[in-house]
């Protein structure tokens, strides 16, 4: 009971009910504040737990390998730890070795590409030498009007395939004919190249012989001149 006068229109029972309501409101406000504080504490705990999760997992794994479980002898556990360490070391060494091999393979590939681009291959040089002699002897062939053109069996088969509208067969036969003609050209070019090479060798040998003969002849002529001059003296 509160001491003092009550305001008009209120009884003691009304005052008691109002005091009880005020007490419940105060208690509810305190409960809300406590709930908010609990929620903030829980959030901070969750954040801390999420940040500490990987550490705890790694620590638990390390402890699992370091601590000897119950029911296993210590000697066996020590052997297991040694094997585990060796296995991890082998993994690290193999990963390093693979990285070095990849770097070396890349360097080798770059070197090979540079060599291919910088230096022409021997096949290309030989091909260039042969292409110089393609069609060299064509001028000695008779003209087309006078020459009797006789088709080969392959050409006749191509004409037959074209008449039958068998395009795939005609293309295949035409490729065979092209390779045959190219082979004939290459054979002629090789023969011409060999002929030119042999001719140059003969010319060089003849020139060397002539030089030797001229040298001996000049010396003999000089001796004869000296002898003749001595006879007149």
Swiss-Prot record:
Protein's organism: Pongo abelii
Skewed-composition ranges (Basic and acidic residues): 39-58
Region (Disordered): 1-126
Skewed-composition ranges (Acidic residues): 13-24
Protein name: Protein FAM204A
Biased composition (Basic residues): 97-109
Taxon lineage: Eukaryota, Metazoa, Chordata, Craniata, Vertebrata
Statement: the UniProt record of this protein carries the keyword Coiled coil: yes
Coiled-coil residue windows: 144-164
Keywords per UniProt: Coiled coil
């Amino acid at each position: 009971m509160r001491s003092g006068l009550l305001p008009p229109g209120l009884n003691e029972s009304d005052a008691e009910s109002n005091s009880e309501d005020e007490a419940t409101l105060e208690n509810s406000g305190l409960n809300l504040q406590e709930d908010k504080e609990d929620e903030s504490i829980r959030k901070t705990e969750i954040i801390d737990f999420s940040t500490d999760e990987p550490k705890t997992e790694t620590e638990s794994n390390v402890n699992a390998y370091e601590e000897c479980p119950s029911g296993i002898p210590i000697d066996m556990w020590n052997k297991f730890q040694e094997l585990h360490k060796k296995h991890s070391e082998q993994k690290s060494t193999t990963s390093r070795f693979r990285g070095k091999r990849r770097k070396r393979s890349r360097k080798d590939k770059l070197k090979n590409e540079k060599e291919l681009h910088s230096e022409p291959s021997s096949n290309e040089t030989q091909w260039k030498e042969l292409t110089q002699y393609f069609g060299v002897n064509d001028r000695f062939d008779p003209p087309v009007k006078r020459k009797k053109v006789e088709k080969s069996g392959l050409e006749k088969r191509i004409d037959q395939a074209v008449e039958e509208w068998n395009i795939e067969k005609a293309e295949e036969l035409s490729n065979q004919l092209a390779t045959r003609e190219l082979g004939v050209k290459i054979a002629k070019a090789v023969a011409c190249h060999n002929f030119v090479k042999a001719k140059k060798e003969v010319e060089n040998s003849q020139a060397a012989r002539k030089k030797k003969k001229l040298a001996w002849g000049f010396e003999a002529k000089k001796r004869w001149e000296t002898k003749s001059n001595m006879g007149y003296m």
